[in-house]
Amino acid sequence: MSWQEKINAALDARRAADALRRRYPVAQGAGRWLVADDRHYLNFSSNDYLGLSHHPQIIRAWKLSAEQFGVGSGGSGHVSGYSVAHQALEEELAEWLGYSRALLFISGFAANQAVITAMMAKEDRIVADRLSHASLLEAASLSPSPLRRFAHNDVTHLARLLASPCPGQQLVVTEGVFSMDGDSAPLEEIQQVTQQHDGWLMVDDAHGTGVIGEQGRGSCWLQKVKPELLVVTFGKGFGVSGAAVLCSNTVADYLLQFARHLIYSTSMPPAQAQALRASLAVIRSDEGDARREKLAALITRFRAGVQDLPFTLADSWSAIQPLIVGDNSRALQLAEKLRQQGCWVTAIRPPTVPAGTARLRLTLTAAHEMQDIDRLLEVLHDNG
C-alpha cells in the first residue's frame, strides 16, 4: 500500500462511518452570536463560558500591552521570552488557587503532554479515567509508563488498579469537569484513594476553572481538594487561550528542567498574559459572580425544558449540556436542521466519544439570554 492509498483508505473509512471531521470558516465564533456566510446564528458551540472573549476591559488590556511589549514574546521563556507580564500572571494565578507556583503554557494540550512526559518513567504507572481528554490519554499512551484506565468516575475500580504492585510511582489522572459529558469527577473520593496508595493526583480543570466555585476557583476548590498537579486553561472561562500548571516549588523547578513542551516552545505573547490578568480580575470580581449566577440560571432553564425530548440528557450541571443521539448520521442531520433554524450546534461523533454515543454538544454561556435558551428549546422540540 502506497502513502496515498493509506491516506485515502483512512479518509474513506471516516466518510463511510459519517465520522469525517470538517472545519467551517466563521467571521465570529465566540460570544452570543456565531457569524458565518453573512448570517448570524445563536451560538451553542463555544467554550467561552463566561462570555469574556469580547469583554472591553480584556480587549483594552491586550491592545495597550501590544503597544508596550509588541505582538510576540521573541522566544522561549528559557531564553528571552519570559517577561514581567508572564511573571505577574503566574504569581496571581498561584495566589488565587492556593499554590506555591504556576507555570504558563501555550495550550492545555501542551501543558498536559509536558507534565506527563516529564514526570513519568518506565517503572511508574499512570491510572486515568477512561473518559479523560485526548491530550491526557495520548501523553499517557506515549510515555514509557504503563497506562491503566478506570471506569468513568468509578472510585472502586480505581482503588483496585492502584492496589496492584507497582515498582515506581503512581499518577492518577482525571478531569474536574469532563469535556464531552459535562459531568464532574468525585475528586474528594479520588484523592482519598490516591493518597491511600501513596500516589499523586493530576486534575485537568479546563472546563471548571473560572466557571464554578468561589471566585471561579474551579472544581478542586469547590470539592476542597488540592491535587499535586492542577492544570487550568484559558480558552474556556477566561475567554482567551493558553494554560497553566499549578504545583509546588520543587515540582515547578523540576518542570522547568525537564518539561520539553515548555523549554522548546515560544512563550505566549506578553500582551496575552496581560489580557489574562485582566480576565482573572473580572473572574474574581462581583461581575464574575454575576456572570456565573446568570450561567447557572440559564442551565436550569435549559434542563427544565429539555426533559421530554427523545434523547438522553447527560447528568451535567455545567455549561456543557450534551444530548446523546446515538447514531452518527442522525446527530449530523439534527445539527444541520438546528443550523437551518438559526442555532449553531456541533455534532460530536466517535472517535471523540465512544461508539454509539454521537451527540449534540450544547454549550451555554453567560453571553446568552433567556430568550436564546427558549429558542433553542423550541427548535429542539420541533426536530425531536
Curated annotation (Swiss-Prot):
Residues bearing the modification N6-(pyridoxal phosphate)lysine: K236
Binding site for pyridoxal 5'-phosphate: G108, F109, S179, H207, T233
GO aspect biological process, one term: biotin biosynthetic process
Positions with a binding annotation for substrate: R21, H133, T352
Cofactors (names): pyridoxal 5'-phosphate
Keyword Transferase in record: yes
Pathway: Cofactor biosynthesis; biotin biosynthesis
Entry keyword annotation includes Transferase: yes
GO molecular function: 8-amino-7-oxononanoate synthase activity; pyridoxal phosphate binding
Protein keywords: Biotin biosynthesis, Pyridoxal phosphate, Transferase
Database matches in SUPFAM superfamilies: PLP-dependent transferases (SSF53383)
Chemical reaction(s) catalysed: 6-carboxyhexanoyl-[ACP] + L-alanine + H(+) = (8S)-8-amino-7-oxononanoate + holo-[ACP] + CO2
Enzyme Commission number, as recorded: 2.3.1.47
InterPro entries in alphabetical order: Aminotrans_II_pyridoxalP_BS, Aminotransferase_I/II_large, AON_synthase_class-II, AONS_Archaea/Proteobacteria, AONS_Proteobacteria, PyrdxlP-dep_Trfase, PyrdxlP-dep_Trfase_major, PyrdxlP-dep_Trfase_small
Subunit structure comment from the entry: Homodimer.
Function: Catalyzes the decarboxylative condensation of pimeloyl-[acyl-carrier protein] and L-alanine to produce 8-amino-7-oxononanoate (AON), [acyl-carrier protein], and carbon dioxide.
Annotated family: Belongs to the class-II pyridoxal-phosphate-dependent aminotransferase family. BioF subfamily.
Protein name: 8-amino-7-oxononanoate synthase
